[in-house]
């Protein structure tokens, strides 16, 4: 009765499917609500904290996704999901110039900075002056708004996966999408810009923003070592084994060549691999986040106020 095909197992599966269906319905309702917001609007959570939400976006109605303390999720009118990365007001309070703001942010997230610098290079998808302008806008916006939004999932597409360069597929930030691969950096920048909504600016993430995401996760209880040294307890790495729920899709990579996509079978455990280029690629679903990044999956783009 309690085996793979037992009554209890089937009852648990039915419960999980019902809960997932209810959650999916709440996301659809939030998406519909987002379409009604033609301008920016204020949102105050249960603890009294207030944040400005972009036009064409609404705060998720799913339990646990509607507080700043827990990790605020918004859904836009296209169904894409974004997470708020808070930067405490005190960090940039005494900074006014771009250089001052940048240095303050670097100091705040210094444990994740290493020796990297945010430097323009040809082929990144932006011209040098455009890069400088966007970087300045980003810094000033973080100061004005005390944070920024990032895509909740890796950028993907519901169109059929490809084995070569093809940027005609519609890009989304939603669970269940195929990862958007086979693109150059400049093409990825174009796709990221196309995901902007509510009059905001969307680009690939600048280095300092990745550092700030890591710092944000640290403030939510993730240890520095898990973020910097060994993230195998929550990441999809070739040498890490973990359970993957049904409803996902997977494809095996062998010597850097991706095979066919298939549905995840029942009781599937992602195996370990010993060689670079071998592994499993998975569609973007919340269940794959395991036990740490319950709000953030793979981060690749961010959205901020263009004119704070």
Q: Residue locations for each model-derived region?
A:
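C-terminal juxtamembrane segment of a hydrophobic transmembrane alpha-helix
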Residues: 1-12
């Amino acid at each position: 009765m309690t085996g793979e095909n037992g009554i209890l197992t089937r009852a648990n599966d039915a419960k999980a499917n019902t809960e997932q269906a209810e959650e999916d319905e709440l996301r659809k309702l939030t998406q519909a609500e987002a379409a009604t917001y033609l301008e920016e609007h204020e949102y105050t959570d249960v603890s009294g904290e207030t944040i400005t939400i972009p036009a064409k976006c609404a705060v998720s109605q799913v339990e646990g996704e509607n507080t700043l303390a827990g990790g605020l999720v918004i859904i836009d009118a296209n169904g894409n999901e974004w997470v708020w990365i808070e930067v405490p007001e005190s960090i940039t309070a005494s900074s006014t110039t771009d250089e001052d703001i940048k240095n303050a942010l670097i100091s705040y997230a210094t444990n994740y900075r290493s020796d990297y610098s945010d430097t323009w290079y040809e082929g990144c998808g932006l011209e040098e002056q455009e890069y400088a302008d966007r970087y300045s806008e980003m810094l000033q916006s973080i100061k004005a708004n005390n944070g920024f939004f990032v895509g909740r999932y890796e950028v993907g597409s519901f169109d059929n996966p490809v084995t070569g360069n093809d940027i005609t597929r519609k890009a989304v930030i939603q669970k269940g999408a195929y990862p958007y691969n086979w693109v150059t950096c400049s093409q990825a920048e174009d796709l990221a810009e196309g995901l902007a909504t509510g009059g905001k600016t969307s680009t690939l993430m600048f280095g300092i923003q990745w550092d700030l995401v890591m710092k944000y996760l640290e403030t939510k209880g993730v240890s520095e070592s898990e973020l910097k040294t060994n993230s195998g307890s929550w990441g999809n790495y070739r040498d890490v084994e973990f359970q993957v729920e049904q409803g996902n899709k997977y494809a095996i990579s062998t010597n850097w060549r991706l095979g066919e996509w298939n549905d995840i079978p029942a009781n599937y455990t992602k195996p370990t691999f010993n060689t670079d280029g071998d592994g499993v690629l998975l569609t973007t679903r919340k269940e794959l986040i395991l036990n740490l990044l319950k709000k953030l999956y793979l981060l690749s783009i961010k959205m901020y106020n263009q004119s704070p």
